[in-house]
């Protein structure tokens, strides 16, 4: 059918393994061309955020080199810190449940049960705190999306908010590791 998008979620090749072998993904990129989106679960890309950034960047660069213009979807990443890092690494689509479980505030991700009362007040019902947090988190995610668009058109890290220096330094570390630029970023 041509009226639906097809996404392929790449998983570890062997049962019992919890990491994707990026070399095999890169060697088999041509087999991904029938798909509109390719996806990875965040934690299967590597043991550290930096390892995941490297994996995303290598996949993105190989895809671009092979003219495979397909968005990369990272499952399990939708928070104020890792989402911009993975975006700078070459990922395009993000989703996760953190926005339902935590409060995105003070440029961080905070546990609702303990931080909610300190932000909203100790007399506010926890159900109300949760509802307010969801609304604020949704607005945060929309703002983040707009910030990505501004960054994409200007290249100015300040568009990424108060953590922009952290993102810039992290991106520079990534470039040193992969030995060059990330296409499209």
How would you describe each model-predicted region?
Residues 11, 40-42, 73-77, 95-97:
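Short His-Asn-centered micro-motif
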Residues 64-71, 80-185:
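Alpha/beta catalytic cores of nucleotide-metabolism and tRNA/nucleoside-modifying enzymes
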